[in-house]
């Protein structure tokens, strides 16, 4: 070790640099300019990119791919690109929204998806009430008095029906299917120069009311398909027909001189017809646009109508007065249907949403909608089951879906047609517990199953009429014969006939070769 006296002396240098706490804050982000005093293109591009990233980070983009697709469709952009993943699609939407924000001169991402949709939903969900008159109060009380005894009668039969062994039910339904599978084309008749738009079979099964695009309503005999009567009154397309409950049935004492049939037209008029004159007995006026469907209440005292003016209305048949104007749809209402009790009404239309209304209180008790459950295109048809708590909806998306108001959810769905579903009818036969004579018991005292409610029929723009089982939702029969889209379909209560009409201007009659029903 070297002695300190021998070590070389080195003078300490003065401290160099600056302490961290003494470093000044620099808020000047200007990039130094070139010799000409103009920022370089590269520096400008970097600044623009940083600003765009900062703006993009402030824009809220949904994580749900369905909402991402919907927003892209709304902006007129391709919903999906070849090989594009979910994350890529979301990033593409963010980029488009960023560009839109830049064009609008927004710096803080004011056009957020969440804010815009929340505002829209608040507008749509805003609830308001309209005071009803004494006629509406009377109508609601009448429906309470009418529906409660019917509901009691229906549930009593359902309790008895629940005792039927499953094995017996399966065997009985199999027999019904076998008889339906034997249905064939039995007749065809051209009934006008324009497309057939609506067909409805009379309660006695001996006539069918036919409406066409020319505004004509005709009565055609079954099974001959000869024209019996031509009603004159409409000036535009017939889009709704409904028979008065019990009309043409001798035991119901409905006179041919009184109201037997109702029709709705594209000119906005509703006409009530007797069977003894070719001009309307009376007309119901109030809709400002096309009347899409009409249907009598099971009591026959009221008539419901659906219209393109986004409302459905309830009319008093005796006084021809408008009892209720009900809003609730954002677009035209295309279909209405009463349940068998007469307490509920289903409505649906071009907004792809259905609603179940309690006629006794005026409240909506169920909405036929949902991300996975609802329809993605307009709903064209509605019909209730004879059990009173299930309703079918048919849509332009080709699907028929079943909704249970007790569970408040969808309970079944069928990809019924390759094109739009135009019409649909759930079979209610002569053995229906409310509209007919329910089946009794066998020799051992066991309850017999009923045919009513065992199947339903549908028509579509794929030129077919189809028959489906209503328990396992399987296809029973496809009736092909129309050369154009089929616009309407109906059945006879005795199960002998199915009638359809379409754009080929014909009415076609389907049945078994032996002339027997199901």
Locate predicted features.
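Intrinsically disordered terminal extensions that flank WD40 beta-propeller domains
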Residues: 1-194
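WD40 beta-propeller repeat fold
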Residues: 161-328, 335-337, 367-374, 383, ...
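Adenine-nucleotide cofactor-binding loop residues
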Residues: 276, 318, 360, 406, ...
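Hydrophobic, structured segments
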Residues: 341-343, 351-409, 420, 431-435, ...
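Conserved "HGTGT" condensation-loop signature of ketosynthase/thiolase-family condensing enzymes
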Residues: 495
């Amino acid at each position: 070790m070297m002695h300190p006296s021998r070590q070389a002396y080195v003078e300490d240098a003065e401290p160099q640099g600056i302490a961290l706490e003494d470093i000044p804050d620099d808020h000047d982000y200007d990039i130094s300019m070139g010799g000409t005093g103009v920022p370089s293109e590269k520096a400008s591009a970097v600044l623009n990119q940083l600003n765009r990233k900062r703006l993009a980070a402030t824009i809220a983009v949904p994580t749900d791919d369905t909402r991402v697709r919907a927003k892209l469709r709304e902006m007129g952009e391709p919903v999906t690109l070849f090989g594009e993943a979910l994350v890529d699609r979301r990033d593409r939407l963010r980029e488009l929204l960023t560009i839109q924000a830049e064009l609008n001169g927004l710096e803080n991402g004011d056009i957020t998806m969440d804010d815009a949709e929340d505002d829209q939903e608040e507008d749509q969900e805003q609830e308001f009430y309209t005071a009803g008159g004494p006629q509406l109060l009377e109508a609601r009380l009448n429906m309470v008095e009418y529906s409660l005894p019917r509901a009691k009668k229906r549930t009593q039969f359902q309790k008895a029906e629940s005792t039927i062994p499953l094995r017996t039910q399966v065997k009985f339904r199999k027999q019904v299917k076998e008889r339906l599978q034997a249905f064939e084309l039995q007749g065809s008749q051209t009934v006008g120069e324009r497309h057939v738009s609506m067909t409805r079979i009379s309660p006695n099964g001996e006539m069918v009311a036919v409406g066409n695009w020319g505004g004509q309503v005709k009565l055609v005999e079954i099974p001959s398909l000869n024209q019996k009567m031509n009603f004159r009154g409409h000036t535009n397309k017939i889009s709704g027909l409904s028979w008065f409950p019990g009309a043409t049935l001798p035991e119901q004492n409905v006179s041919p001189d009184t109201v037997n049939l109702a029709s709705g037209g594209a000119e906005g008029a509703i006409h009530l017809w007797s069977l003894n004159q070719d001009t309307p007995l009376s007309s119901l006026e109030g809709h400002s646009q096309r009347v899409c469907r009409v249907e009598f209440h099971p009591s026959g005292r009221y008539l419901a109508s659906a219209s393109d003016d986004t409302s459905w209305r309830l009319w008093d048949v005796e006084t021809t007065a408008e009892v209720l104007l009900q809003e609730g749809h954002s677009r035209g209402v295309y279909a209405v249907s009463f349940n068998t009790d007469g307490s509920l009404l289903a409505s649906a239309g071009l907004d792809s949403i259905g609603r179940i209304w309690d006629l006794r209180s005026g409240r909506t008790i169920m909405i036929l909608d949902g991300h996975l459950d609802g329809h993605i295109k307009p709903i064209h048809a509605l019909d209730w089951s004879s059990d009173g708590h299930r309703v079918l909806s048919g849509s332009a998306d080709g699907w028929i879906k079943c909704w249970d108001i007790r569970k408040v959810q969808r309970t079944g769905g069928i990809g019924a047609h390759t094109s739009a579903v135009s019409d649909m009818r759930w079979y209610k036969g002569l053995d229906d517990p409310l509209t007919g004579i329910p089946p009794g018991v066998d020799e051992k005292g066991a309850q017999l199953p009923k045919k009513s409610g065992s199947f339903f029929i549908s028509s579509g723009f794929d030129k077919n009429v189809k028959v489906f089982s209503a328990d396992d939702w399987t296809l029973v029969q496809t009736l092909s014969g129309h050369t154009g889209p089929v616009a309407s379909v109906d059945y006879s209560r005795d199960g002998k006939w199915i009638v359809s009409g379409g754009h080929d201007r014909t009415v076609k009659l389907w049945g078994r070769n032996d002339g027997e029903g199901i």
